[in-house]
């Protein structure tokens, strides 16, 4: 380790101990080395013993800086690894940091564009509109049209910081695996590998631009959701240019009401947007916290959501959607056995799981929720309770479903903040029933047939050749089968002959032994020689 890495490692360790995070690792679970290290740092005490452990964990990560904040945010989605009281606190982490020098941002943009900003933009504001740990946003206008745009640029100094802290995370993860046996099941090195990939992906704004363009296409012309246009010609790996929007932040209830917004419709549209993304598009914005969601102020009676920052998205395949739909319908029909069986059939819990025990565990946590009126039930908390229960049965949580559950909690929270009487079930049920109807029955058969029609239309002219090839291959196969069968019969005959010769030889050898005991040596010798000859012939027969 370099001196700077040792200094940083000491600072990380000091912060962790000052927040009492050594409580995460019970002393009985430690080997001798970490016990001695803890005693060696005796002067570092827990400064906040009155605060809950989850809150202390969140505060420590905030103090350690952007890389650790984002690590905590990612860990908040891994409810297969962390108990609820820790995961809930990690979900509260906010990625807010002081802006960096606007001139540095401008220099970085010009390097990405290959020339002065004046070649493409006017009215560039050197003061940032927003700032986060990975990127910063500035405003300007397009020179040729005067259109207002925003420029999102990656911090020029962030990669060395990320790489340095990631190296330390790997060292710490390996030490944890080596010296804390109980922590090995959490696979800390694999967790860091996953985080490194996620973080490095965020350094490439082309990925976010692609996500935004996909979401915009999906809701083209929609009254429910608007996604700002990306100016792709001016965007690159470390710079994304998109249209500037003006809206009311969705959490600003006072301003929304002052603008005369139809709060009931706005809340219902939030739920509708979510389920449309999931069941129609299989592609959803997975970071819909209040900072990324605005409301178009132009038509308050017909309010439209505006979605920003598409850096994190989720995708679902047919199996994922079927799992979600059948589970939710199973829950609302109180069919917990079906829910438990679905998990076993999908392979998300081990095949030897006791379905009755799993059903009972699900019933225990979900019955209190479903005792409420349907309008008060939280879908997000239903899935959350399901994940926490399945975790006890060694369920391997699917990342895309965890993202979906987190997004659903955001949408529900916003919806009920806007309109407390929001009945999510009334809004969601048509989506679930319509999607399920398309998956089973005649409609599903017709849909599947129409999806395969282009393939069969392409293959139809080849059908005669395919039939001829199949018949020819069948004839060749029959000939080979006849040869194999003839060989098999010949082999069986040889084996029978060999067995017969072996038995005769064995009989003659036994006779020679009897004759020898009676002192009839000549006959005994002839019998032994003949028996040996028969054995030799039997061996040759077997060899064939």
Curated annotation (Swiss-Prot):
A Pfam family reported for this protein in Swiss-Prot or TrEMBL: ABC1
EC id: 2.7.-.-
Pathway: Cofactor biosynthesis; ubiquinone biosynthesis [regulation]
Alphabetized SUPFAM superfamilies for the sequence: Protein kinase-like (PK-like)
InterPro entries registered for this protein in UniProt: ABC1_dom, Kinase-like_dom_sf, UbiB, UbiB_bact, UbiB_kinase
Domain of life: Bacteria
Predominant location: membrane
GO cellular component: plasma membrane
Domain Protein kinase residues, every copy: 123-501
GO molecular function: ATP binding; protein kinase activity
Transmembrane spans: 515-537
Any one GO biological process: ubiquinone biosynthetic process
Catalytic-site annotation from UniProt: 287
Locations listed in the record: Cell inner membrane
Family: Belongs to the ABC1 family. UbiB subfamily.
Protein name listed in UniProt: Probable protein kinase UbiB
Organism whose genome encodes this protein: Aliivibrio fischeri (strain MJ11) (Vibrio fischeri)
């Amino acid at each position: 380790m370099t001196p700077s890495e040792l200094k940083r490692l000491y600072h990380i360790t000091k912060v962790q101990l000052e927040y009492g995070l050594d409580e995460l690792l019970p002393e009985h679970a430690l080997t001798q080395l970490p016990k001695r290290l803890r005693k060696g740092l005796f002067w570092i005490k827990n400064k906040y013993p009155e605060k809950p452990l989850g809150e202390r964990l969140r505060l420590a990560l905030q103090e350690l800086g952007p890389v650790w904040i984002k690590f905590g945010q990612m860990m908040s989605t891994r409810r297969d690894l962390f108990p609820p009281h820790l995961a809930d606190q990690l979900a509260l982490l906010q990625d807010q940091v002081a802006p960096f020098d606007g001139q540095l941002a401008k220099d970085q943009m010009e390097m990405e564009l290959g020339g002065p900003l004046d070649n493409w933009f006017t009215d560039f504001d050197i003061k940032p509109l927003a700032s986060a740990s990975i990127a910063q946003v500035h405003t300007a206008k397009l020179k040729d049209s005067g259109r207002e745009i925003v420029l999102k640029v990656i911090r020029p100094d962030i990669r060395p910081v990320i790489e340095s802290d990631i190296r330390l995370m790997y060292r710490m993860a390996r030490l944890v695996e080596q010296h804390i046996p109980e922590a090995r099941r959490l696979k800390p090195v694999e967790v860091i590998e996953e985080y490194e990939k996620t973080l490095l992906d965020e350094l490439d704004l082309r990925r976010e631009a692609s996500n935004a363009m996909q979401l915009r296409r999906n809701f083209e012309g929609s009254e429910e959701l608007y996604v700002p246009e990306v100016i792709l010609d001016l965007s690159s790996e470390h710079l994304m240019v998109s249209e500037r929007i003006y809206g009311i932040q969705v959490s600003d209830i006072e301003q929304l009401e002052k603008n005369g917004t139809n709060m009931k419709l706005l809340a219902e549209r939030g739920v509708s947007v979510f389920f449309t993304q999931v069941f129609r598009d299989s592609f959803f914005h997975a970071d819909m916290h209040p900072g990324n969601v605005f409301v178009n102020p132009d038509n308050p009676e017909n309010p439209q959501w505006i979605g920003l920052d598409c850096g994190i998205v989720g995708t679902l395949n047919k199996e994922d959607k079927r799992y979600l739909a059948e589970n939710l319908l199973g829950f609302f029909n109180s069919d917990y056995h079906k829910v438990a069986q679905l998990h076993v059939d999908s392979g998300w819990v081990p095949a030897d799981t006791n379905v009755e025990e799993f059903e009972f565990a699900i019933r225990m946590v979900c019955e209190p929720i479903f005792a409420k009126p349907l309008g008060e039930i939280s879908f997000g908390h239903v899935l959350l309770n399901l994940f926490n229960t399945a975790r006890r049965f060694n369920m391997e949580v699917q990342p895309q479903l965890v993202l979906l559950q987190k997004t659903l909690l955001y949408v529900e929270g916003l919806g009920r903040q806007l309109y407390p009487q929001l009945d999510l079930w009334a809004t969601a049920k048509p989506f679930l029933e319509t999607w399920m109807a398309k998956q089973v029955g005649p409609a599903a058969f017709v849909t599947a047939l129409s999806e395969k029609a282009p393939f069969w239309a392409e293959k139809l002219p080849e059908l005669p050749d395919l039939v001829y090839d199949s018949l020819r291959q069948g004839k060749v196969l029959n000939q080979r089968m006849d040869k194999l069968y003839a060989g098999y019969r010949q082999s069986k005959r040889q084996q029978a002959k060999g067995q017969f010769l072996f038995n005769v030889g064995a009989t003659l050898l036994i006779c020679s032994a009897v004759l020898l005991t009676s002192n009839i040596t000549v006959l005994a010798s002839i019998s032994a020689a003949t028996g040996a000859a028969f054995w030799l012939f039997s061996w040759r027969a077997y060899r064939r």
